[in-house]
Amino acid sequence: MNMIDNAKAQVRQLTVAAYEKAAAAGLLPAGTTVEPAVEIPKDTANGDYTTTFCLAAAKAMKMNPRQVAQTLADAMTLEGSYFTSVEIAGPGFMNFRLGGKWFADTVAAIESAGEKYGENDSLAGKKYMVEFVSANPTGPMHMGNARGGVLGDTLASVLQKSGAHVWREFYVNDAGNQIEKFAKSLEARYFQIIKGEDAVEFPEDGYHGDDIRELAQAFYEKEGDKYLDCDEKTRHDALAQFGLSVNIPKMKSDLARYGIRYDQWFFESSLHESGYVAESVQALTDKGYTYEKDGALWLKTSEILASQLRREGKSDEAIEKLGLKDDVLRRANGFYTYFAADIAYHRNKFAVRGFDKVINIWGADHHGHVARLKGAMDALGLDGEHRLDIVLMQLVKLVRDGEIVRMSKRTGKAISLTDLLDEIPVDACRWFFNAKPETQMEFDLGLAVREDSENPVYYVQYAYARICTLLKTLAAEGYTVPAAAEAELSVLTADEEKTLIKQLAQYPAVVYLAARDYDPSFINRYLVELAAAFHKFYNACRIKGEAENVLLSRLKLADTARAVLKNGMTLIGCSAPEKM
Protein backbone atom coordinates (compact mmCIF):
# COMPACT_ATOMS: atom_id res chain seq x y z
CA MET A 1 0.00 0.00 0.00
CA ASN A 2 1.38 3.40 -1.02
CA MET A 3 0.16 5.85 1.59
CA ILE A 4 1.46 8.85 -0.34
CA ASP A 5 -0.60 7.86 -3.37
CA ASN A 6 -3.57 7.34 -1.07
CA ALA A 7 -3.18 10.84 0.36
CA LYS A 8 -2.86 12.37 -3.12
CA ALA A 9 -5.95 10.47 -4.28
CA GLN A 10 -7.87 11.78 -1.28
CA VAL A 11 -6.87 15.39 -2.06
CA ARG A 12 -8.24 14.90 -5.57
CA GLN A 13 -11.45 13.33 -4.23
CA LEU A 14 -11.97 16.12 -1.68
CA THR A 15 -11.32 18.79 -4.30
CA VAL A 16 -13.69 17.28 -6.88
CA ALA A 17 -16.39 16.69 -4.25
CA ALA A 18 -16.11 20.30 -3.04
CA TYR A 19 -16.28 21.60 -6.60
CA GLU A 20 -19.37 19.52 -7.42
CA LYS A 21 -21.01 20.70 -4.20
CA ALA A 22 -20.22 24.37 -4.92
CA ALA A 23 -21.35 24.05 -8.55
CA ALA A 24 -24.63 22.42 -7.49
CA ALA A 25 -25.24 25.36 -5.13
CA GLY A 26 -24.56 27.84 -7.93
CA LEU A 27 -21.41 29.17 -6.26
CA LEU A 28 -19.14 28.09 -9.13
CA PRO A 29 -19.80 27.49 -12.85
CA ALA A 30 -20.59 23.85 -13.65
CA GLY A 31 -18.88 21.75 -16.30
CA THR A 32 -15.21 22.15 -15.39
CA THR A 33 -13.23 19.06 -16.42
CA VAL A 34 -9.83 20.02 -14.99
CA GLU A 35 -8.17 17.09 -13.17
CA PRO A 36 -6.70 18.24 -9.83
CA ALA A 37 -2.89 18.00 -9.90
CA VAL A 38 -1.46 17.16 -6.46
CA GLU A 39 2.12 17.62 -5.30
CA ILE A 40 4.18 17.53 -2.11
CA PRO A 41 5.51 21.07 -1.45
CA LYS A 42 9.27 21.47 -1.19
CA ASP A 43 8.69 23.53 1.96
CA THR A 44 6.41 21.58 4.30
CA ALA A 45 5.70 24.82 6.17
CA ASN A 46 3.23 25.37 3.33
CA GLY A 47 1.43 22.12 4.09
CA ASP A 48 1.89 18.43 3.40
CA TYR A 49 0.12 18.36 0.02
CA THR A 50 -0.91 21.07 -2.40
CA THR A 51 -3.14 21.29 -5.47
CA THR A 52 -3.05 23.82 -8.30
CA PHE A 53 -6.60 22.94 -9.37
CA CYS A 54 -7.92 26.44 -8.74
CA LEU A 55 -5.22 28.07 -10.85
CA ALA A 56 -6.11 25.87 -13.83
CA ALA A 57 -9.90 25.85 -13.35
CA ALA A 58 -10.18 29.62 -12.78
CA LYS A 59 -9.23 30.30 -16.41
CA ALA A 60 -12.18 28.28 -17.68
CA MET A 61 -14.45 29.82 -15.04
CA LYS A 62 -13.15 33.35 -15.77
CA MET A 63 -12.78 33.92 -12.03
CA ASN A 64 -10.02 34.90 -9.62
CA PRO A 65 -8.14 31.72 -8.55
CA ARG A 66 -8.13 32.74 -4.88
CA GLN A 67 -11.89 33.24 -5.00
CA VAL A 68 -12.30 29.76 -6.49
CA ALA A 69 -9.99 28.32 -3.83
CA GLN A 70 -11.87 30.00 -0.98
CA THR A 71 -15.20 28.77 -2.32
CA LEU A 72 -13.87 25.22 -2.51
CA ALA A 73 -12.35 25.41 0.97
CA ASP A 74 -15.69 26.58 2.40
CA ALA A 75 -17.49 23.70 0.66
CA MET A 76 -14.96 21.05 1.63
CA THR A 77 -15.68 18.46 4.30
CA LEU A 78 -12.49 17.09 5.90
CA GLU A 79 -14.17 14.99 8.57
CA GLY A 80 -13.09 11.36 8.28
CA SER A 81 -10.28 12.22 5.88
CA TYR A 82 -6.51 12.18 6.36
CA PHE A 83 -6.44 15.98 6.61
CA THR A 84 -7.11 18.40 9.43
CA SER A 85 -7.04 21.66 7.50
CA VAL A 86 -6.89 23.26 4.07
CA GLU A 87 -5.37 26.70 3.59
CA ILE A 88 -5.29 29.14 0.69
CA ALA A 89 -1.87 30.44 -0.28
CA GLY A 90 -0.31 32.61 -2.98
CA PRO A 91 -2.34 33.13 -6.16
CA GLY A 92 -4.67 30.22 -5.42
CA PHE A 93 -2.83 27.17 -4.08
CA MET A 94 -4.80 24.92 -1.74
CA ASN A 95 -2.51 23.45 0.92
CA PHE A 96 -3.60 20.41 2.94
CA ARG A 97 -2.20 19.39 6.33
CA LEU A 98 -2.15 15.76 7.40
CA GLY A 99 -3.80 14.63 10.61
CA GLY A 100 -3.05 11.79 12.99
CA LYS A 101 -5.11 9.24 11.04
CA TRP A 102 -2.71 9.23 8.08
CA PHE A 103 0.35 8.81 10.31
CA ALA A 104 -1.29 5.95 12.24
CA ASP A 105 -2.54 4.28 9.05
CA THR A 106 0.95 4.49 7.53
CA VAL A 107 2.52 2.64 10.45
CA ALA A 108 -0.28 0.06 10.27
CA ALA A 109 0.17 -0.37 6.50
CA ILE A 110 3.89 -1.04 6.88
CA GLU A 111 3.18 -3.56 9.62
CA SER A 112 0.55 -5.30 7.47
CA ALA A 113 2.82 -5.52 4.41
CA GLY A 114 5.77 -6.91 6.37
CA GLU A 115 8.63 -7.97 4.09
CA LYS A 116 6.45 -7.16 1.07
CA TYR A 117 6.43 -3.46 1.92
CA GLY A 118 7.62 -1.44 -1.06
CA GLU A 119 6.40 -3.93 -3.64
CA ASN A 120 4.36 -2.67 -6.58
CA ASP A 121 2.76 -4.27 -9.63
CA SER A 122 4.00 -1.83 -12.27
CA LEU A 123 5.79 -4.68 -14.10
CA ALA A 124 3.42 -7.51 -13.18
CA GLY A 125 3.26 -10.26 -15.79
CA LYS A 126 6.41 -9.05 -17.58
CA LYS A 127 9.29 -11.42 -18.24
CA TYR A 128 12.66 -9.68 -17.86
CA MET A 129 16.22 -10.84 -18.38
CA VAL A 130 19.13 -8.97 -16.84
CA GLU A 131 22.47 -9.99 -18.33
CA PHE A 132 25.41 -8.63 -16.40
CA VAL A 133 29.14 -9.04 -15.75
CA SER A 134 29.64 -11.54 -18.63
CA ALA A 135 33.39 -11.07 -18.22
CA ASN A 136 35.81 -12.86 -20.50
CA PRO A 137 36.76 -16.09 -18.69
CA THR A 138 40.41 -15.50 -19.56
CA GLY A 139 41.51 -13.99 -16.27
CA PRO A 140 40.49 -12.44 -12.95
CA MET A 141 37.45 -10.16 -12.81
CA HIS A 142 38.30 -6.46 -12.53
CA MET A 143 36.62 -3.41 -10.99
CA GLY A 144 34.35 -2.84 -13.98
CA ASN A 145 33.01 -6.36 -13.47
CA ALA A 146 32.61 -5.64 -9.76
CA ARG A 147 30.52 -2.56 -10.48
CA GLY A 148 28.49 -4.27 -13.19
CA GLY A 149 27.81 -7.18 -10.87
CA VAL A 150 26.27 -4.99 -8.20
CA LEU A 151 24.29 -2.88 -10.65
CA GLY A 152 22.89 -5.90 -12.46
CA ASP A 153 22.07 -7.93 -9.37
CA THR A 154 20.47 -5.01 -7.52
CA LEU A 155 18.52 -3.88 -10.57
CA ALA A 156 17.19 -7.42 -10.96
CA SER A 157 16.00 -7.36 -7.33
CA VAL A 158 14.34 -3.97 -7.79
CA LEU A 159 12.55 -5.18 -10.93
CA GLN A 160 11.33 -8.23 -9.02
CA LYS A 161 9.96 -5.99 -6.27
CA SER A 162 8.06 -4.15 -9.01
CA GLY A 163 6.31 -7.34 -10.07
CA ALA A 164 8.48 -8.59 -12.94
CA HIS A 165 9.59 -12.18 -13.38
CA VAL A 166 13.37 -11.72 -13.60
CA TRP A 167 16.05 -14.02 -14.99
CA ARG A 168 19.71 -13.34 -14.16
CA GLU A 169 22.20 -14.48 -16.80
CA PHE A 170 25.96 -14.56 -17.35
CA TYR A 171 27.09 -14.87 -20.99
CA VAL A 172 30.33 -16.85 -21.15
CA ASN A 173 32.53 -15.80 -24.08
CA ASP A 174 34.17 -19.20 -24.51
CA ALA A 175 34.68 -18.91 -28.27
CA GLY A 176 36.37 -16.59 -30.73
CA ASN A 177 39.47 -14.40 -30.73
CA GLN A 178 39.75 -13.90 -26.96
CA ILE A 179 39.87 -17.63 -26.36
CA GLU A 180 42.46 -18.08 -29.12
CA LYS A 181 44.58 -15.34 -27.53
CA PHE A 182 44.10 -17.06 -24.16
CA ALA A 183 45.31 -20.37 -25.62
CA LYS A 184 48.35 -18.75 -27.25
CA SER A 185 49.27 -17.02 -23.98
CA LEU A 186 49.04 -20.31 -22.08
CA GLU A 187 50.97 -22.05 -24.85
CA ALA A 188 53.86 -19.58 -24.60
CA ARG A 189 54.09 -20.00 -20.80
CA TYR A 190 53.80 -23.78 -21.19
CA PHE A 191 56.70 -23.80 -23.66
CA GLN A 192 58.74 -21.52 -21.39
CA ILE A 193 58.28 -23.95 -18.49
CA ILE A 194 59.60 -26.79 -20.64
CA LYS A 195 62.24 -25.00 -22.74
CA GLY A 196 63.22 -22.06 -20.56
CA GLU A 197 62.05 -18.46 -20.23
CA ASP A 198 64.28 -17.08 -22.98
CA ALA A 199 63.63 -19.86 -25.47
CA VAL A 200 60.10 -18.74 -26.35
CA GLU A 201 58.88 -15.24 -27.18
CA PHE A 202 55.63 -14.26 -25.48
CA PRO A 203 52.88 -12.84 -27.75
CA GLU A 204 52.91 -9.04 -27.55
CA ASP A 205 49.10 -8.86 -27.40
CA GLY A 206 48.81 -11.84 -25.04
CA TYR A 207 47.66 -11.93 -21.43
CA HIS A 208 50.66 -11.06 -19.28
CA GLY A 209 49.19 -11.64 -15.82
CA ASP A 210 50.62 -13.97 -13.21
CA ASP A 211 47.41 -15.99 -13.44
CA ILE A 212 48.50 -17.19 -16.91
CA ARG A 213 51.81 -18.41 -15.48
CA GLU A 214 49.97 -20.22 -12.69
CA LEU A 215 47.54 -21.88 -15.10
CA ALA A 216 50.36 -23.01 -17.40
CA GLN A 217 52.27 -24.42 -14.42
CA ALA A 218 49.19 -26.31 -13.24
CA PHE A 219 48.63 -27.65 -16.76
CA TYR A 220 52.26 -28.80 -16.95
CA GLU A 221 52.04 -30.50 -13.56
CA LYS A 222 48.95 -32.36 -14.74
CA GLU A 223 49.94 -33.21 -18.33
CA GLY A 224 53.72 -32.95 -18.43
CA ASP A 225 55.20 -32.36 -21.89
CA LYS A 226 52.71 -34.56 -23.78
CA TYR A 227 51.34 -31.52 -25.64
CA LEU A 228 54.76 -30.23 -26.67
CA ASP A 229 54.91 -31.93 -30.07
CA CYS A 230 51.25 -32.38 -30.95
CA ASP A 231 49.46 -30.29 -33.57
CA GLU A 232 48.71 -26.69 -32.64
CA LYS A 233 44.91 -26.98 -32.64
CA THR A 234 44.95 -29.96 -30.27
CA ARG A 235 47.33 -28.12 -27.94
CA HIS A 236 45.32 -24.88 -28.06
CA ASP A 237 42.05 -26.71 -27.38
CA ALA A 238 43.55 -28.57 -24.42
CA LEU A 239 45.11 -25.44 -22.92
CA ALA A 240 41.98 -23.33 -23.38
CA GLN A 241 39.68 -25.97 -21.93
CA PHE A 242 41.97 -26.47 -18.96
CA GLY A 243 42.15 -22.72 -18.34
CA LEU A 244 38.38 -22.34 -18.57
CA SER A 245 37.84 -25.32 -16.26
CA VAL A 246 39.83 -23.45 -13.61
CA ASN A 247 38.70 -19.88 -14.27
CA ILE A 248 34.93 -20.32 -14.60
CA PRO A 249 34.42 -22.09 -11.24
CA LYS A 250 36.63 -19.39 -9.68
CA MET A 251 34.42 -16.70 -11.20
CA LYS A 252 31.31 -18.43 -9.88
CA SER A 253 32.88 -18.68 -6.44
CA ASP A 254 33.94 -15.02 -6.35
CA LEU A 255 30.52 -13.84 -7.50
CA ALA A 256 28.75 -16.04 -4.94
CA ARG A 257 31.01 -14.58 -2.26
CA TYR A 258 29.88 -11.19 -3.58
CA GLY A 259 26.25 -12.22 -3.09
CA ILE A 260 25.55 -12.83 -6.78
CA ARG A 261 24.02 -16.01 -8.16
CA TYR A 262 22.70 -16.54 -11.65
CA ASP A 263 19.78 -18.48 -13.05
CA GLN A 264 21.95 -19.50 -15.99
CA TRP A 265 25.51 -19.36 -17.30
CA PHE A 266 24.96 -19.28 -21.06
CA PHE A 267 27.95 -20.40 -23.18
CA GLU A 268 28.72 -18.71 -26.49
CA SER A 269 30.11 -21.99 -27.79
CA SER A 270 26.65 -23.58 -27.54
CA LEU A 271 25.36 -21.14 -30.17
CA HIS A 272 28.05 -22.23 -32.61
CA GLU A 273 27.76 -25.95 -31.85
CA SER A 274 23.98 -25.94 -32.30
CA GLY A 275 24.19 -24.05 -35.58
CA TYR A 276 22.14 -21.19 -34.18
CA VAL A 277 24.68 -18.54 -35.21
CA ALA A 278 24.55 -19.74 -38.81
CA GLU A 279 20.76 -19.94 -38.64
CA SER A 280 20.49 -16.37 -37.31
CA VAL A 281 22.80 -15.02 -40.00
CA GLN A 282 20.73 -16.86 -42.61
CA ALA A 283 17.58 -15.22 -41.18
CA LEU A 284 19.15 -11.81 -41.83
CA THR A 285 20.13 -12.92 -45.33
CA ASP A 286 16.60 -14.11 -46.04
CA LYS A 287 15.30 -10.67 -45.08
CA GLY A 288 17.74 -9.00 -47.47
CA TYR A 289 20.02 -7.45 -44.86
CA THR A 290 23.33 -9.04 -45.89
CA TYR A 291 25.68 -9.00 -48.87
CA GLU A 292 29.00 -10.58 -49.84
CA LYS A 293 32.22 -8.66 -50.43
CA ASP A 294 35.85 -9.82 -50.53
CA GLY A 295 34.74 -13.34 -49.62
CA ALA A 296 33.09 -12.18 -46.38
CA LEU A 297 29.41 -11.82 -45.49
CA TRP A 298 28.42 -8.34 -44.32
CA LEU A 299 25.42 -6.95 -42.45
CA LYS A 300 23.85 -3.82 -43.96
CA THR A 301 24.28 -2.04 -40.64
CA SER A 302 24.44 1.42 -42.21
CA GLU A 303 21.15 0.87 -44.04
CA ILE A 304 19.42 -0.47 -40.92
CA LEU A 305 20.60 2.40 -38.72
CA ALA A 306 19.86 5.03 -41.37
CA SER A 307 16.26 3.82 -41.62
CA GLN A 308 15.91 4.03 -37.86
CA LEU A 309 17.37 7.55 -37.78
CA ARG A 310 14.98 8.70 -40.52
CA ARG A 311 12.07 7.45 -38.42
CA GLU A 312 13.43 9.63 -35.61
CA GLY A 313 13.38 12.65 -37.91
CA LYS A 314 17.05 12.85 -38.94
CA SER A 315 17.77 14.25 -42.40
CA ASP A 316 19.77 12.32 -45.00
CA GLU A 317 22.44 15.00 -44.80
CA ALA A 318 22.80 14.58 -41.03
CA ILE A 319 22.88 10.79 -41.38
CA GLU A 320 25.58 10.95 -44.04
CA LYS A 321 27.80 12.96 -41.70
CA LEU A 322 27.70 10.12 -39.15
CA GLY A 323 29.76 7.89 -41.42
CA LEU A 324 27.78 4.74 -40.65
CA LYS A 325 29.57 1.50 -41.51
CA ASP A 326 28.58 -2.08 -42.20
CA ASP A 327 29.73 -5.07 -40.12
CA VAL A 328 31.26 -8.40 -41.03
CA LEU A 329 29.18 -11.38 -39.91
CA ARG A 330 31.23 -14.18 -41.47
CA ARG A 331 34.87 -13.76 -42.38
CA ALA A 332 36.41 -14.95 -45.63
CA ASN A 333 37.88 -17.93 -43.73
CA GLY A 334 34.35 -19.08 -42.88
CA PHE A 335 34.46 -18.17 -39.18
CA TYR A 336 31.65 -16.10 -37.69
CA THR A 337 32.47 -12.85 -35.90
CA TYR A 338 31.71 -12.02 -32.29
CA PHE A 339 28.99 -9.67 -33.53
CA ALA A 340 27.29 -12.52 -35.39
CA ALA A 341 27.31 -14.62 -32.21
CA ASP A 342 25.98 -11.66 -30.22
CA ILE A 343 23.11 -11.25 -32.69
CA ALA A 344 22.31 -14.95 -32.36
CA TYR A 345 22.47 -14.76 -28.57
CA HIS A 346 20.02 -11.87 -28.40
CA ARG A 347 17.75 -13.46 -30.99
CA ASN A 348 17.70 -16.49 -28.68
CA LYS A 349 16.66 -14.28 -25.76
CA PHE A 350 13.64 -12.93 -27.62
CA ALA A 351 12.61 -15.51 -30.22
CA VAL A 352 13.39 -18.73 -28.33
CA ARG A 353 13.02 -17.85 -24.66
CA GLY A 354 10.39 -15.15 -25.05
CA PHE A 355 11.62 -12.39 -22.78
CA ASP A 356 9.51 -9.23 -22.98
CA LYS A 357 12.46 -7.06 -22.04
CA VAL A 358 16.21 -7.69 -22.01
CA ILE A 359 18.54 -5.42 -20.05
CA ASN A 360 22.30 -5.62 -20.55
CA ILE A 361 24.77 -3.95 -18.18
CA TRP A 362 27.77 -2.85 -20.24
CA GLY A 363 30.83 -0.73 -19.77
CA ALA A 364 30.60 2.71 -21.39
CA ASP A 365 33.37 1.71 -23.80
CA HIS A 366 30.78 -0.49 -25.56
CA HIS A 367 28.52 2.46 -26.41
CA GLY A 368 29.23 2.10 -30.13
CA HIS A 369 27.79 -1.42 -30.09
CA VAL A 370 24.37 -0.40 -28.72
CA ALA A 371 22.71 0.94 -31.88
CA ARG A 372 24.20 -1.87 -34.01
CA LEU A 373 22.75 -4.60 -31.82
CA LYS A 374 19.37 -2.91 -31.45
CA GLY A 375 19.30 -2.42 -35.21
CA ALA A 376 20.05 -6.10 -35.84
CA MET A 377 17.14 -7.06 -33.58
CA ASP A 378 14.88 -4.65 -35.46
CA ALA A 379 16.01 -6.19 -38.75
CA LEU A 380 14.99 -9.60 -37.40
CA GLY A 381 11.55 -8.23 -36.48
CA LEU A 382 12.21 -8.46 -32.73
CA ASP A 383 11.70 -4.77 -31.88
CA GLY A 384 15.12 -4.20 -30.39
CA GLU A 385 14.39 -0.49 -30.16
CA HIS A 386 11.85 -1.07 -27.38
CA ARG A 387 12.61 -4.54 -26.02
CA LEU A 388 16.40 -4.30 -25.65
CA ASP A 389 17.76 -1.81 -23.13
CA ILE A 390 21.45 -1.24 -22.50
CA VAL A 391 22.61 0.34 -19.25
CA LEU A 392 26.06 1.83 -19.79
CA MET A 393 28.22 2.25 -16.70
CA GLN A 394 31.23 4.50 -16.44
CA LEU A 395 34.72 3.57 -15.31
CA VAL A 396 35.77 2.85 -11.73
CA LYS A 397 38.83 4.42 -10.14
CA LEU A 398 40.21 2.93 -6.95
CA VAL A 399 41.59 5.51 -4.54
CA ARG A 400 43.86 4.83 -1.59
CA ASP A 401 45.20 7.62 0.63
CA GLY A 402 44.13 10.18 -1.95
CA GLU A 403 45.99 8.52 -4.82
CA ILE A 404 44.49 6.58 -7.71
CA VAL A 405 45.42 2.89 -7.80
CA ARG A 406 46.16 2.08 -11.43
CA MET A 407 44.65 -1.02 -12.97
CA SER A 408 46.04 -2.99 -15.88
CA LYS A 409 44.78 -6.51 -16.41
CA ARG A 410 47.39 -7.33 -19.03
CA THR A 411 50.42 -6.19 -17.03
CA GLY A 412 49.42 -8.42 -14.14
CA LYS A 413 49.05 -5.45 -11.79
CA ALA A 414 45.29 -5.29 -11.75
CA ILE A 415 43.33 -5.40 -8.51
CA SER A 416 40.88 -8.24 -9.04
CA LEU A 417 37.49 -8.78 -7.46
CA THR A 418 39.11 -11.42 -5.27
CA ASP A 419 41.69 -8.91 -4.05
CA LEU A 420 38.98 -6.35 -3.34
CA LEU A 421 36.84 -8.76 -1.32
CA ASP A 422 39.89 -9.79 0.70
CA GLU A 423 40.36 -6.17 1.76
CA ILE A 424 36.89 -4.61 1.81
CA PRO A 425 33.71 -6.05 3.41
CA VAL A 426 31.12 -7.28 0.92
CA ASP A 427 28.52 -4.85 2.27
CA ALA A 428 30.77 -1.88 1.60
CA CYS A 429 31.62 -3.13 -1.90
CA ARG A 430 27.98 -3.61 -2.81
CA TRP A 431 26.99 -0.25 -1.33
CA PHE A 432 29.65 1.86 -3.03
CA PHE A 433 29.39 0.17 -6.42
CA ASN A 434 25.62 0.71 -6.42
CA ALA A 435 26.10 4.30 -7.61
CA LYS A 436 24.38 5.97 -10.56
CA PRO A 437 25.66 3.98 -13.56
CA GLU A 438 26.25 7.01 -15.77
CA THR A 439 28.65 8.65 -13.32
CA GLN A 440 32.35 7.86 -13.24
CA MET A 441 33.08 6.76 -9.70
CA GLU A 442 36.00 6.80 -7.34
CA PHE A 443 35.97 3.94 -4.87
CA ASP A 444 37.73 5.20 -1.74
CA LEU A 445 39.23 2.09 -0.17
CA GLY A 446 39.89 3.96 3.07
CA LEU A 447 36.34 5.31 3.41
CA ALA A 448 34.86 1.87 2.74
CA VAL A 449 36.35 0.46 5.96
CA ARG A 450 35.79 3.48 8.22
CA GLU A 451 33.43 3.00 11.14
CA ASP A 452 31.87 6.44 11.40
CA SER A 453 29.08 8.53 9.89
CA GLU A 454 31.25 9.46 6.89
CA ASN A 455 30.85 5.88 5.65
CA PRO A 456 27.22 5.67 4.44
CA VAL A 457 26.86 1.91 4.74
CA TYR A 458 28.14 2.03 8.32
CA TYR A 459 25.82 4.98 9.05
CA VAL A 460 22.76 3.05 7.85
CA GLN A 461 23.75 -0.21 9.53
CA TYR A 462 24.43 1.67 12.76
CA ALA A 463 20.88 3.06 12.71
CA TYR A 464 19.53 -0.47 12.33
CA ALA A 465 21.75 -1.86 15.09
CA ARG A 466 20.83 1.05 17.35
CA ILE A 467 17.14 0.16 17.03
CA CYS A 468 17.84 -3.53 17.68
CA THR A 469 19.76 -2.64 20.84
CA LEU A 470 16.87 -0.43 21.98
CA LEU A 471 14.34 -3.22 21.41
CA LYS A 472 16.50 -5.71 23.30
CA THR A 473 17.03 -3.33 26.23
CA LEU A 474 13.33 -2.53 26.59
CA ALA A 475 12.36 -6.18 26.17
CA ALA A 476 14.55 -6.95 29.19
CA GLU A 477 12.50 -4.37 31.09
CA GLY A 478 9.23 -6.01 30.04
CA TYR A 479 8.29 -3.78 27.10
CA THR A 480 7.50 -5.48 23.80
CA VAL A 481 6.62 -3.83 20.51
CA PRO A 482 2.83 -3.51 20.30
CA ALA A 483 0.75 -4.13 17.20
CA ALA A 484 -0.23 -0.94 15.40
CA ALA A 485 -3.86 -1.44 16.36
CA GLU A 486 -2.91 -1.64 20.05
CA ALA A 487 -0.53 1.33 20.14
CA GLU A 488 -1.81 4.82 20.87
CA LEU A 489 -0.22 6.25 17.73
CA SER A 490 -2.15 9.52 18.03
CA VAL A 491 0.49 10.66 20.56
CA LEU A 492 3.10 10.80 17.78
CA THR A 493 2.78 14.52 17.15
CA ALA A 494 6.38 15.79 17.36
CA ASP A 495 7.88 17.11 14.12
CA GLU A 496 10.63 14.47 14.26
CA GLU A 497 8.05 11.69 14.60
CA LYS A 498 5.99 12.98 11.68
CA THR A 499 9.08 13.48 9.53
CA LEU A 500 10.18 9.90 10.18
CA ILE A 501 6.77 8.49 9.26
CA LYS A 502 6.69 10.58 6.07
CA GLN A 503 10.12 9.21 5.20
CA LEU A 504 8.92 5.65 5.80
CA ALA A 505 5.98 6.31 3.49
CA GLN A 506 8.33 7.30 0.65
CA TYR A 507 9.82 3.82 0.28
CA PRO A 508 7.34 2.31 -2.23
CA ALA A 509 7.78 5.31 -4.55
CA VAL A 510 11.56 4.99 -4.31
CA VAL A 511 11.42 1.32 -5.32
CA TYR A 512 9.15 2.20 -8.24
CA LEU A 513 11.53 4.93 -9.45
CA ALA A 514 14.57 2.66 -9.12
CA ALA A 515 12.88 0.11 -11.40
CA ARG A 516 11.52 2.68 -13.84
CA ASP A 517 14.86 4.46 -14.29
CA TYR A 518 17.08 1.35 -14.05
CA ASP A 519 18.88 3.11 -11.21
CA PRO A 520 19.00 1.09 -7.97
CA SER A 521 21.11 3.82 -6.32
CA PHE A 522 17.76 5.43 -5.44
CA ILE A 523 17.60 2.86 -2.64
CA ASN A 524 21.01 3.84 -1.23
CA ARG A 525 20.13 7.52 -1.09
CA TYR A 526 16.78 6.74 0.50
CA LEU A 527 18.35 4.58 3.21
CA VAL A 528 20.77 7.36 4.20
CA GLU A 529 17.84 9.79 4.45
CA LEU A 530 15.81 7.28 6.47
CA ALA A 531 18.72 6.64 8.85
CA ALA A 532 19.14 10.40 9.31
CA ALA A 533 15.42 10.81 10.04
CA PHE A 534 15.58 8.02 12.61
CA HIS A 535 18.65 9.46 14.36
CA LYS A 536 16.91 12.87 14.61
CA PHE A 537 13.79 11.24 16.02
CA TYR A 538 15.77 9.16 18.50
CA ASN A 539 17.79 12.13 19.70
CA ALA A 540 14.76 14.43 20.04
CA CYS A 541 12.07 12.06 21.33
CA ARG A 542 12.89 10.22 24.52
CA ILE A 543 11.59 6.66 24.75
CA LYS A 544 12.80 5.21 28.05
CA GLY A 545 11.28 6.97 31.03
CA GLU A 546 8.22 8.31 29.19
CA ALA A 547 4.62 7.48 30.04
CA GLU A 548 3.82 3.96 28.90
CA ASN A 549 1.49 5.00 26.06
CA VAL A 550 4.18 7.32 24.65
CA LEU A 551 6.97 4.79 25.22
CA LEU A 552 5.10 2.01 23.40
CA SER A 553 4.05 4.24 20.49
CA ARG A 554 7.60 5.48 19.99
CA LEU A 555 8.87 1.94 20.34
CA LYS A 556 6.45 0.90 17.60
CA LEU A 557 7.70 3.72 15.38
CA ALA A 558 11.33 2.74 15.98
CA ASP A 559 10.54 -0.87 15.12
CA THR A 560 8.77 0.24 11.94
CA ALA A 561 11.90 2.15 10.92
CA ARG A 562 13.93 -0.97 11.68
CA ALA A 563 11.73 -3.07 9.39
CA VAL A 564 12.03 -0.65 6.46
CA LEU A 565 15.79 -0.25 6.93
CA LYS A 566 16.15 -4.03 6.77
CA ASN A 567 13.87 -4.21 3.75
CA GLY A 568 16.00 -1.71 1.85
CA MET A 569 19.34 -3.19 2.91
CA THR A 570 18.18 -6.65 1.85
CA LEU A 571 17.02 -5.28 -1.49
CA ILE A 572 20.50 -3.95 -2.35
CA GLY A 573 22.22 -7.08 -1.06
CA CYS A 574 23.67 -5.66 2.17
CA SER A 575 23.34 -7.21 5.61
CA ALA A 576 21.49 -5.65 8.53
CA PRO A 577 23.58 -6.48 11.64
CA GLU A 578 21.77 -6.37 14.97
CA LYS A 579 24.88 -5.11 16.72
CA MET A 580 27.98 -3.29 15.53
Q: What kind of feature is each model-predicted range?
A:
Residues 2-104, 111, 115-580:
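Non-catalytic interaction-recognition regions
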